[in-house]
Regions:
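A short helix->loop->beta-strand "cap" motif at the edges of active sites that frequently abuts
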Residues: 84-88, 121
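Conserved glycine-rich Rossmann-like NAD(P)H-binding loop of the short-chain dehydrogenase/reductase
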Residues: 25-32
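Mid/C-terminal beta-alpha module of Rossmann-like enzyme folds, strongest
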Residues: 177-239, 253-295
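NAD(P)H-binding glycine-rich loop region in Rossmannoid oxidoreductase-like domains
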Residues: 35-84, 94-99
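Oxidoreductase cofactor-interface core, primarily capturing Rossmann-like NAD(P)-dependent enzymes
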Residues: 100-211
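N-terminal Rossmann NAD(P)H-binding glycine-rich loop of SDR-like oxidoreductase domains
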Residues: 1-23
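Residues forming the Rossmann-fold NAD(P)(H) cofactor-binding site
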Residues: 13-14, 71, 110
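SDR active-site strand-loop-helix element
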Residues: 6, 54-55, 89-95, 126-128
Length: 295
């Protein structure tokens, strides 16, 4: 098949590109900054069988706002797909996305879902939890934080659970929706097979990188304040405000109704030492070079 992938240079989009090209499918790559003009997109989409819309952000930078990247871009992609006669659109969304929750990230992801569901196109909306793997934010920043700080601050005074989802399992499901044309007009939730506390996830990563940090529960408001500082001064923030909201809620239940995932597509990869090691970057501790004003 011929597939357009938006956000193709990002974490999930990049893994999807690798999977599909490895199977011999033709992939057209589009960056999230190239989604502003419907007519130009329609020309690119012409002759394509499907669009995988993976473009997204977890913090706002200048004109790259949640409204523009998640909502306006999705509206443009859906309109261009209709014009070009694309058969299928697969939207990458977030597990807890929902309306009227007070989080611009969650609400904009929900708006994108609604645009796709009401587009008239055959669609699959994939509401994924916390995804990890080579090139991710979770393992990359967690491991670097462990190399930098002897204390790790847990989000909230009462721990919440997560179900880490291997990017390989996510891409497997997206491939089924695109290539095999499964999951027609469905909104599904994808979570890893193992429910653990964030502290346990930190301990497992720490063991792999050879660190033994002290784990300290901190109020959510403290993390939000630190996240705002990170967003302001770091090129790629250690954490963002949206990520703190995500972790403070827990990531084990969808924020809106979904349909069950077929048995053969249910994620199976556990958050094991091998999986963690395969996804870890080569980088060490944070340094001055991570600050915005350093080249």
């Amino acid at each position: 098949v011929k597939v357009v992938i938006t956000g193709a240079s990002g974490f999930i989009g990049g893994h999807l590109v690798t999977r599909l090209t490895g199977e011999g499918h033709e992939v057209v790559r589009i960056a999230r900054r190239d989604l502003a003009h419907v007519d130009q997109l329609a020309a690119v989409f012409a002759g394509c069988n499907a669009v995988a819309h993976c473009a997204g952000i977890n913090r706002e930078i200048a004109d790259q706002t949640y409204a523009r990247v998640h909502v306006e871009s999705t509206r443009n992609v859906a309109a261009a797909a209709r014009t070009a006669g694309v058969e299928k659109i697969v939207l990458m969304s977030f597990l807890r996305a929902r309306p009227n929750c007070g989080s611009p990230y969650h609400e904009s992801k929900w708006e994108a879902e609604e645009i796709v569901r009401n587009s008239g196109l055959n669609y699959t909306v994939v509401k994924a939890g916390i995804v990890y793997g080579r090139g991710d934010h979770m393992l990359t920043h967690l491991s670097r934080a462990l190399h930098t700080f002897p204390i790790f601050g847990l989000v909230g005074l009462k721990e919440k659970s997560i179900r880490p989802l291997a990017v390989e399992d996510l891409v497997h499901v997206m491939r089924a929706a695109i290539v095999d044309r499964r999951l027609k007009r469905q909104t599904i939730a994808l979570l890893g097979p193992e429910e653990i506390y964030l502290s346990e996830a930190v301990r497992r990563v720490a063991e792999v990188v050879g660190k033994r940090p002290s784990l300290l529960p901190l109020p959510v408001v403290c993390h939000e304040l630190m996240a705002r500082v990170f967003e302001r001064f770091m090129k790629v923030p250690l954490t963002s405000v949206a990520q703190i909201r995500i972790l403070s809620e827990g990531v084990v239940e969808p924020g809106s109704p979904v349909v069950p995932v077929p048995y053969d597509l249910v994620p199976t990869r556990r958050f094991t030492t091998e999986q963690i090691r395969n996804g870890l970057p080569q980088g060490g501790p944070f340094c001055v070079g991570d600050l915005r004003w350093c080249s």
